Amino acid sequence: MTIAVGRAPERGWFDVLDDWLKRDRFVFVGWSGLLLFPCAYLALGGWLTGTTFVTSWYTHGLASSYLEGCNFLTVAVSSPANAFGHSLLFLWGPEAQGDFTRWCQIGGLWTFTALHGAFGLIGFMLRQFEIARLVGIRPYNAIAFSAPIAVFVSVFLMYPLGQSSWFFGPSFGVAGIFRFILFLQGFHNWTLNPFHMMGVAGVLGGALLCAIHGATVENTLFEDGEQANTFRAFEPTQAEETYSMVTANRFWSQIFGIAFSNKRWLHFFMLFVPVTGLWMSAIGIVGLALNLRAYDFVSQELRAAEDPEFETFYTKNILLNEGLRAWMAPQDQPHQNFVFPEEVLPRGNAL
């Protein structure tokens, strides 16, 4: 008998850290967690701090915190003033000079929340990649999650980067987002943009597909147990199918004359529709950042200007956009000292 005596190879700090990060625990950490957890914690903490205590008086001339009397729908972490351009507004930078109160007043929490939020979302996508690799499945969850990341980055970062300052990015709040949507409509005619149309089709189409799929599966469950309801009859480890694809195919073939017969194509289509829609809308927002025009039906505008009896829904919407610009510009750009007399404000032909 031969006995071999040797020393186990020494493990470096990287291997030790890798084992610790990937240890099986209730909440998986992983390498992605080094980015996800700190950034998500700081972004959420910055938003809660701003909405609770910090005013927007110095940046937008508004009250925006619970402390000032706002509610959940009207609080916001507001974007910095236009004068700061695209400065990252570091706490130690020349704007705040280490003064935390001043940093909050000038909008430092917005850049803090936006950047940590973006990296937190990217960390969550990397988390899905990492766990998919460890479990041994394909990474389509992470690929799908790239769509909301693209929308967030395009709206909160790319759009204001294309404009004159962070000021034109949306504030982090419900009413603040609504104001931003109205701004996009008034200054970019966003609802008539084909990329917006594709985004709406993707989101609503995805919701429709989700509802149809869920209802169809519920409709075709096998009666495979004596329990009080169909949910208790399911076992996570059962080998057989829990619903009938053949029956579902027959049903929709009768409804539309055509139906999915391949589960893999069906679920890929459910993935493709909303993800593509969100990506298209993100591309459209980047176009708005560059002030690209979409559809302008100039012939209708010229005819409406010449003929008092000719007006279309398009020309009325153009007038609404002019009204939005006239009312929002003095508020958003007070340093320009805009003054619009009543006679230049838009009025439809019918008025």
UniProtKB/Swiss-Prot annotation:
GO terms for biological process: photosynthetic electron transport in photosystem II. Pfam families: Photo_RC. It catalyses: 2 a plastoquinone + 4 hnu + 2 H2O = 2 a plastoquinol + O2. It is an enzyme of class 1 (oxidoreductase). Chlorophyll a ChlzD2 binds at residue 116. 2 of the reaction center chlorophylls (ChlD1 and ChlD2) are entirely coordinated by water. Belongs to the reaction center PufL/M/PsbA/D family. PSII is composed of 1 copy each of membrane proteins PsbA, PsbB, PsbC, PsbD, PsbE, PsbF, PsbH, PsbI, PsbJ, PsbK, PsbL, PsbM, PsbT, PsbX, PsbY, PsbZ, Psb30/Ycf12, peripheral proteins PsbO, CyanoQ (PsbQ), PsbU, PsbV and a large number of cofactors. It forms dimeric complexes. This is Photosystem II D2 protein.
